[in-house]
Design a protein with these regions (language model features):
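Zinc-dependent metallopeptidase catalytic helix centered on the HExxH motif
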Residues: 43, 49-50, 54-80
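Stable alpha-helical elements in mature extracytoplasmic
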Residues: 63, 67-70, 88-92, 104-108, ...
Length: 307
């Protein structure tokens, strides 16, 4: 069976299972009448249309006794700020219930009735933001797989914080004075930095470097005309990024195109081979504009690079 068929079958199984759980939860539950809901117009987040903003006074008095009530309140009356652009529908709530239990659903519903609109209520209840919950739902259900592109799940040194490290320009270019100095050292790049500094760079949760040169072989690589300084590094030097504990490199700089299109594509190929995510340049505009996401400690952090 192909991978695509397995994903489709898995998605169908999840859908059927969610529907079965919904039937069990709804059995003997009190239904909220149309009169109780009132004539307030509420547009579903799934429709893709603009969501009507509701004041607390617009929400009818609903006594939450069971999951049916809780689902109704969240689906009909949760403000768009609380949902933070995520598609919270019946399927998502059934998954949420299966993962975090009845009380978590009801607590969210009570927050809606209390006029809450802070999306952090999801994090406070589960330890995951609504954005991370949505990614977990997509991962588990097989739906919205495009949402998982360029997402990196990172372990942090401490549960209470996320530590990012940012370095300025790095340059491994051939015949450049810093590269020549590095070659003269017994332990190469490691001798160019103190052990304490390298340990600090390797110890952060995410280390980001600005790749201020191109990776390309000398044969066939031609620098662009008219530039006073052009930087080209042997592709094998990409292995040095590991010494810094590099997690991502930025390419939105004035030297990534020093060797034209061929040099740029070679740089992207080398980084892909090393498994180093990059931002700020790409094989096309979409690739160059991509956002890199890190998920740490229940939070989703977006990173972009531009110049």
């Amino acid at each position: 069976m192909s991978g695509k068929c397995r994903k489709i079958m898995y998605a169908l199984v999840v859908t059927v299972f969610a529907a079965f759980l919904w039937m069990i939860c709804c059995e003997n539950d009190r239904k909220v009448s149309d009169k109780a809901i009132g004539e307030t117009t509420v547009q579903s987040m799934r429709s893709g249309e603009k969501t009507v903003s509701l004041e607390q006074s617009d929400i009818p008095k609903i006594e939450i006794k069971d999951l049916t009530d809780a689902f109704t309140v969240i689906l009909q009356y949760a403000p768009k700020d609380m949902l933070a652009g995520c598609t919270v529908d019946e399927s998502f709530l059934m998954w949420f219930y299966a993962q975090y239990g009845r009380d978590a659903v009801i607590h969210i519903a009570f927050d809606v009735l209390d006029g809450g609109n802070d999306p952090d209520v999801w994090y406070e209840e589960t330890g995951n933001s609504i954005h991370v919950l949505w990614l977990l739902y997509c991962r588990d259900s097989g739906f919205g797989q495009h949402e998982l592109e360029n997402v990196y799940w990172m372990q942090t040194a401490a549960a209470s914080e996320m530590v990012f490290g940012f370095a300025g320009d790095i340059n491994f270019a051939e015949n450049w004075y810093t590269t020549e100095y590095m070659k003269e050292q017994p332990d190469g790049l490691r001798d160019c930095f103190s052990e304490d500094l390298l340990a600090q760079m390797q110890g952060v949760d995410v280390m980001i470097m600005n790749n201020e040169f191109t990776y390309a072989n000398k044969k066939g690589a031609t620098s662009v005309y008219g530039k006073a300084y052009t930087f080209r590094a042997d592709p094998q030097k990409a292995e040095l990024l590991e010494i810094f504990g590099t997690d991502t490199v930025t390419l939105a700089n004035n030297h990534v195109y020093d060797y034209g299109k061929r040099g740029l594509l070679s740089t992207l190929d080398v980084l892909d081979q090393e498994g180093i995510p990059y931002s700020g340049a790409g094989r096309n505009l979409k690739d160059a504009s991509k956002i890199i996401y890190y998920v740490m400690n229940g939070r989703k952090v977006a990173f972009v690079s531009a110049t």
